[in-house]
Amino acid sequence: FDGEGQITSAIGYVTSEDLPILYTLEGHGEKEMDSTIKEDIEKANMDIQSLNLLTEGSVPDDADCLFIDSPSTDISEDEKTAIIDYLENGGKAMIFSDYTTEDLPNFDAVLENYGVQREAGIVFEGDNQHYAMQMPYYLVPTINSTDASSETVSGGYYVLVPYAQGIKKMDDVRDTVTINSILTTSDQAYSKTDLNSDTLEKEDGDEAGPFDLGVSITETLDD
């Protein structure tokens, strides 16, 4: 029984006038939210609602956060514009991606608007201290202490990240955007682009690490 978590949740509830709302984007083959994550969000007293931007047209004004979990098909041009408009007006988002052979130019454009790109392929780890169960694609990255990860670091927890894509920080980023690394591989990691290969070892054409697997991005907006 997670007594401490439940108590914290109760305190947050009675001290908050309104229940924060997290909208989960749907309509593009997104993953269903993991039950453990859903429980944690609900314990933090956040209301979870689904969002179809094709029918709604924009992110609702009462959104406290937009959750985009690994779309397998691309968002539309209008959805891309709606998401960027929401973020550029102070909105918050949690965005995840999985490896896919599908082109996702509009989804990628949202990421690139904030200075990051998805690496091609899946990241493998060459340092056996940074992967689990003897599988070099079950990554155990270094957790860097940021506002988003300080509790995980201070608690001494590990994060397991299987079948991950690397995140590339772009060179040309506007001055108002700050990108901080949360999860990073060792410098022996590599991203395999040929997933039909007969070997898990690094080959010609594989991108050399280290890689970010998770980042936090903030932008300073004019008042």
Task: Give residue spans per PLM region.
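Short, surface-exposed patches at the edges or C-terminal ends of soluble domains, predominantly
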Residues: 1-223
